[in-house]
Curated annotation (Swiss-Prot):
Any one GO molecular function term: ATP binding
List of residues binding ATP: G73, L91, T104, R105, H106, R107, T108
Protein name, UniProt field: DNA integrity scanning protein DisA
Enzyme class: transferase
Amino acid sequence: MRIEKDKELMNILKIMAPGTPLREGLENILRAKTGGLLILGDSDQILKLVDGGFKINSEYSPSYVYELAKMDGSIVLSSDLKKILCANAQLIPDSSIPTFETGTRHRTADRVAKQTGSIVIAISQRRNIITVYKGGIKYVLRDSSIILARANQALQTLEKYVAVLDRVVNNLNILEFKDIATLFDVVTAIQRSEMVMRIVSEIERYICELGNEGRLIDMQLSELIKSVEEDGILLIRDYCRSNMEYEDIYKQIQGLSSEELLNLDGLSKIIGYTGVPLVDTLISPRGYRMINKIPRIPSNVIENLVANFNQLKCVMEASYEQLDNVEGIGEARAKAIKNGLRRLREQIMLDKV
């Protein structure tokens, strides 16, 4: 349910991540210091900009691209990256398209990308860098060792943030079972959950850019976060005003700047509590998050429970007969819910000690 920021850039990075045939070809050109200009796509719009060169129409291979880059012109690849269509070609984009690039190769790449919306790759001969253009996007590919170092640093930061989130959530769990949770406790947990998810999004981008070299980072990330996002959404569902859509609230929280996210009063307004003191306002959870922790309870049954009882404390105080009357709950499931909540409470109180 995360808003997919930079989705287009992520797709580009996947195509040319380390380990892919395209990246191998680009690295070969980079090491040879010949420079190069590659365009990915074979639409009529692209081919109209191509002048001269040799029609190759050969299977793509990193070594072929490397050899063809020794010539001055650009290389045109098919959109599926399976064929080299032509080499040593001159690209003639519309010169009225604005560009802030300086070198001829990069100016051409920028204009072609803006005119056609295709991926164009410029490899600088002197600066030894690979720049990717697509539409208005410009991105400089970085060396894997640099990205790996940043990803590891981000993982260490994430570990600390997850530890803080765990403490905040464990405290909220105790308060929920005692029915003395305040608005301050709730918005702090929502805030911490969003902070963790923002670091996760950053690491996911690094993993995407690392390609097959990012497998270990991906495994560490999966181990660290587990159900953080799901719990964050259930927190919002537990405490937002009943006339509000939790999905809209979650999107709104994601849209906050880093400074706005630090403002707990602003967060409380987003979940529907305006002009009330954070510390003195007691609120009861609906029970989505806690009941969700009980094994083998389907989501539709949880919905029915919340609709019938409206608060977690009412579910806990309900008799087996009252639970049995809820649609989708029989005698066995009523016992599972009662026993499950009792065990959860005992476990949370033990963890406190």
